[in-house]
Regions:
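Non-catalytic, solvent-exposed segments at the cell envelope interface
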Residues: 2-24, 34-638, 647
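Acidic, glycine-rich low-complexity segments
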Residues: 642
């Protein structure tokens, strides 16, 4: 019996061992099969993502979305329509692999699971671009071609505008969420995955940014012009020849009325036709940022100073109130739009050139900014004639933009506007709160930074010398990360440089209207009445004497603190023989609206001289890369360089 039992135990042991071996073999086989399936899936995804990126890169989609001119915009949409099916073939396969059980289970692995999760986000975003967003764009383009944004009588087709905006907006919102999630995903550990995602993210970021610009423009147009009933808008035309914080001094103002899609332009009035009014209620930003006003000298309501604050909603309210107090004004303004000379030039790329009524001047997409900011003061010396020229040019360009919006013009407009709003050449504001939400989301309202996690510092300039010399100012900036701090915040060093390129010879030969007409006597009397100390008055008087010299420009600088962050170590260096150190280096802390600024009285620049403002910024913990906002320049895009010296 014992012998028999022993044999049974031995047999059982053999069976158990064999079962273990079989189990191990099965597990190993399953693991090998899973690993093989994972490797195969990874190769498929890598190949399809790489090909998707190549299709987007080589197809000209980016150029189509960013192009200007009616022909290029339509050709771009045709290119998108042609390439979308090819792109979908690759993105659908990649997304199918990433959504399969093999890839999903790999996403749960410790450490490297994030690699697979990030890949799934990337394939989702690429497929959304190919299968949802691009078809929405081409569908919208086809809708505009068939129905048009303008009816046969030239009036705006409100139904088409809102329909097109809604289609693209929904797809864009999905894409932006996916791209944000992808950018927030941890960096992959596996080199092959990391390389594929790096290429894919760069392509997606570029396409998503351009698509967001198109969607934002359509949303903004729908918010302002897509209503039933009547809307009345004030139009500000700013001149970059005389810099103000939001762009340039307001040179002419007109109205635009939209009545169930029917657009009509009112008369434009030059700033010289405006009366100075008693102080208006919305002067906080203007009084605190315009240097003379900070000394206690109130200008009251002056339409030229509406742009002295970089917070355009406040500027719009100021302009609305000043307009209402003019003999030709009204109390029925629903919103305010603003265009500077760079914007007017870009819009002529949409509408085509115009020849002014004199027959002597043709404004084009190449010469308008220079002519309106500089040449006009040389060619037309009579101020009344200048005023008439500005009134006519602004009215005709803006009217040409909005009238007869066929598909070609509409597509060109939505391709042109994002760069203009991004760089503060165009602003849009409505006094309707529901519209404000749309416009703020679209990024067209021109506000200083409002989000601690997306920090923005600003450098804003108000010209104090009554000159038209800012066409000759060349500006550049650098933003360098210098440290990643223990609390998760980051420190940056900002450098902002301005050079007066006007030569000493030009300062004596150019018209005085350009080189300066500073009213020394009047301003001296105003300063005497101010609350400044005797020492301050002496420094200010010295500055005003310098501003009376031809070609000397005075820039009051306001630095905006990012929300949740701080600004420190502000310094100014200058080689200008007319500099007044006490006025350029003393930065007063002020608050206008919800923004904290540090502002000086003026940096004075002689012809050929340069000044540089430098300061440090600390962001809120765990914030994104610091961005620099600034008063728009004479170029479409500001010259800003971002570097990272903290790593």
């Amino acid at each position: 019996m014992r012998h028999k039992a022993g044999k049974e135990n031995e047999t059982q042991t053999k069976h158990t061992g064999r079962n273990i071996v079989i189990a191990v073999v099965v597990v190993l086989a399953a693991f090998c099969a899973y690993a093989a399936a994972l490797v195969h899936s990874a190769m498929v995804i890598k190949d399809e993502v790489t090909q998707s990126v190549g299709v987007v890169r080589d197809s000209g989609i980016g150029a189509a979305l960013a192009g200007s001119g009616q022909d290029s915009s339509m050709a771009g949409m045709t290119a998108i329509e042609a390439v979308a099916p090819q792109l979908q073939q690759h993105t659908t396969v990649a997304r199918g692999q990433a959504d399969g059980w093999v890839w999903r289970s790999a996403s749960m692995l410790p450490v490297i699971g994030n690699d697979f999760a990030a890949t799934r986000i990337a394939t989702d975003a690429l497929d959304t671009l190919a299968s949802d967003v691009l078809p929405s764009l081409t569908d919208a383009a086809n809708t505009m071609q068939k129905a048009g944004l303008a009816n046969a009588d030239g009036n705006l087709n409100v139904k088409t505008l809102t329909e097109v905006s809604s289609k693209i907006s929904k797809s864009n919102d999905t894409l932006q969420r996916q791209v944000t999630a992808l950018n927030e995903a941890p960096e992959p550990h596996i080199a092959q995955v990391r390389d594929a995602l790096t290429s894919g993210k760069a392509t997606l970021d570029s396409a998503a940014s351009q698509i967001n610009g198109v969607a934002s423009t359509l949303d903004s147009l729908a918010a302002l012009f897509g209503h039933e009933g009547t809307r009345n808008y004030l139009i500000l035309s700013q001149t970059n020849a005389e810099t103000q914080a939001a762009g340039g001094v307001v040179g002419s103002v007109g109205t635009l009325t939209v009545n169930n899609g029917t657009i009509s332009m009112g008369q434009f009035y030059s700033d010289s036709k405006f009366d100075l009014t008693a102080p208006v209620t919305s002067t906080d930003g203007v009084d605190k940022l315009y240097a003379i006003s900070r000394l206690g000298v109130s200008y009251g309501g002056d339409i030229r100073l509406a742009s002295a604050t970089p917070n355009f909603p406040a500027a719009a309210q100021y302009a609305k109130e000043v307009w209402a107090r003019q003999s030709f004004g009204s109390n029925n303004i629903d919103g305010v739009l603003s265009f500077d000379t760079v914007a007017l030039q870009s819009l002529l790329g949409v509408t085509g050139p115009i020849t002014l009524s004199s027959g002597k001047v043709t404004l084009t997409a190449q010469n308008t900014a220079q002519y309106l900011s500089n040449q006009v003061y040389i060619d037309i010396t009579d101020q009344n004639a200048q005023d008439a020229f500005f009134e006519e040019s602004a009215q005709r360009i803006i009217n040409g933009m909005l009238s007869g919006l066929n598909a070609h013009k509409a597509l060109s407009l939505v391709a042109t506007m994002p760069k203009l709003t991004e760089n503060r050449h165009v602003y849009m504001w409505s006094f309707d709160k529901s519209d404000q939400k749309v416009l703020k989301k679209a990024g067209v309202v021109g506000e200083p930074g409002t989000d601690a996690q997306n920090p923005v510092t600003g450098v804003y300039v108000n010209e104090m010398g009554w000159t038209k010399t800012d066409w000759y100012m060349k500006k550049s900036a650098t933003v360098s990360k210098t440290a990643d701090n223990k609390d998760g915040s980051s420190t940056y060093h900002v450098t902002y440089t301005t050079t007066n390129t006007m030569t000493a010879d030009q300062s004596t030969k150019l018209p005085a209207y350009i080189t300066g007409t500073f009213p020394l006597g009047m301003m001296s009397d105003l300063v005497k009445q101010s609350g400044a100390s005797d020492e301050e008055k002496a420094a200010i008087h010295a500055a005003m004497e310098s501003l009376s010299k031809p070609g000397v420009v005075g820039h009051s600088i306001a630095i905006a603190k990012p929300v949740g962050g701080s600004v420190s170590n502000i310094t100014v260096t200058s080689d200008s023989k007319d500099q007044i150190p006490a006025l350029q280096s003393d930065f007063m802390k002020i608050k206008a609206g919800s923004t904290t600024y540090y502002a000086n009285i003026a940096c004075l620049l002689s012809p050929g001289a340069t000044f540089t403002v430098e300061y440090d910024v600390k962001t809120a913990p765990h914030a994104a890369q610091l961005q620099l906002d600034q008063t728009p320049t004479n170029n479409l895009a500001a010259q800003v360089t971002y570097t990272d010296s903290g790593r």
